[in-house]
Amino acid sequence: MAEGSVMFSDVSIDFSQEEWDCLDPVQRDLYRDVMLENYGNLVSMGLYTPKPQVISLLEQGKEPWMVGRELTRGLCSDLESMCETKLLSLKKEVYEIELCQREIMGLTKHGLEYSSFGDVLEYRSHLAKQLGYPNGHFSQEIFTPEYMPTFIQQTFLTLHQIINNEDRPYECKKCGKAFSQNSQFIQHQRIHIGEKSYECKECGKFFSCGSHVTRHLKIHTGEKPFECKECGKAFSCSSYLSQHQRIHTGKKPYECKECGKAFSYCSNLIDHQRIHTGEKPYECKVCGKAFTKSSQLFQHARIHTGEKPYECKECGKAFTQSSKLVQHQRIHTGEKPYECKECGKAFSSGSALTNHQRIHTGEKPYDCKECGKAFTQSSQLRQHQRIHAGEKPFECLECGKAFTQNSQLFQHQRIHTDEKPYECNECGKAFNKCSNLTRHLRIHTGEKPYNCKECGKAFSSGSDLIRHQGIHTNK
């Protein structure tokens, strides 16, 4: 290889497992991007063909410290047999080289601090001379700084910044987040100003930085190279895998200083803190309603657009949220995973269980400010408030009759369609309301749950009891 060339070992930095564990997911992604980009640059320049194991591991989403690469590998076969190296510790900015056969070589351990990449090359030249290479070069030549391509000069600066995360001079005045590089700072600011200049050619969606487009493209390709060893679930990027693994470890590193509640994800902590501050930064431009999360605003916007992208394959019913579709599908499957510990009754959704549990606790947290009546569910309160407001938003298109509840309109429309979906298994008689079928079944069972407190007479329906009570009041 001619002088002025560069090898992969010259643009690669190794981490021990301890050093790797100190990096957060963002730092690991940055390291991975730099290493893969540099290898790609070498290949495109025709300088390096065999794929190093560390590159294969990074492409598979595995940890790079699994490769115990000697510093001298690929430089000289004689040197490989005589020496072994300690992994580079960037955190201390010290390159430590330990020679195995000190007695033969007459060399001792060297611990030198380097201020530039050129110093590394100078020390390698010094080491080569002591090993018997008069020109200060190994049998396979190393490039010199003046011939160094620009992308390689940036490599060690970038990797240095990965470790020295305290050196972040670029601070965002909006949110206080700090960055080590001006380019990262500029990309971050696009979040606040809403600038999205990177477009996905598949669907036309825009992003604030190029790496987000790369990650987004995996949605279209279905590529999920990062797999969880615990459960086999795969992800499109390594940071998602890192976050997912906290489910198995139970790790919740993000703690709220107000109440002490801890979270697995930083984004969850940020959302939670808005409960304490009352901040709702995401406002709907159509109706002015504000939300604590951008996802809530995104879902809310579908009310105005009428968009329902989540469709049930069984019956064709569509929903604005994927969670609503999941709940709906349990109607078809009969799945009820949420069980009440008090009575054993099971429900298809967690919210339905929460509402049910209030029967046992007697809790009615939703109070009407008009009359003081309390309800177990917020939807019940909203329906009740329409009585005071005189609001009847659900109108029948056939006859113009209006109702306070959508379910009332739905039942009313069966009068026009003559639909009677509730059939008695005893006699085959059908009804347009479930309550009418329930009342009818008492004819067959003889059940009379409504008792008169005056005379003790029992009735099968509440309306029959009310009519009977008129006898006592007219006396």
From Swiss-Prot:
Alphabetically ordered keywords of this record: Cytoplasm, DNA-binding, Metal-binding, Nucleus, Repeat, Transcription, Transcription regulation, Zinc, Zinc-finger
One GO biological process term: regulation of transcription by RNA polymerase II
MF (Gene Ontology): DNA-binding transcription factor activity; RNA polymerase II cis-regulatory region sequence-specific DNA binding; zinc ion binding
InterPro entries reported for this sequence: KRAB, KRAB_dom_sf, Krueppel_C2H2_ZnFinger, Znf_C2H2_sf, Znf_C2H2_type
CC per GO annotation: cytoplasm; nuclear membrane; nucleoplasm
Sequence similarity: Belongs to the krueppel C2H2-type zinc-finger protein family.
Protein's name in the database: Zinc finger protein 383
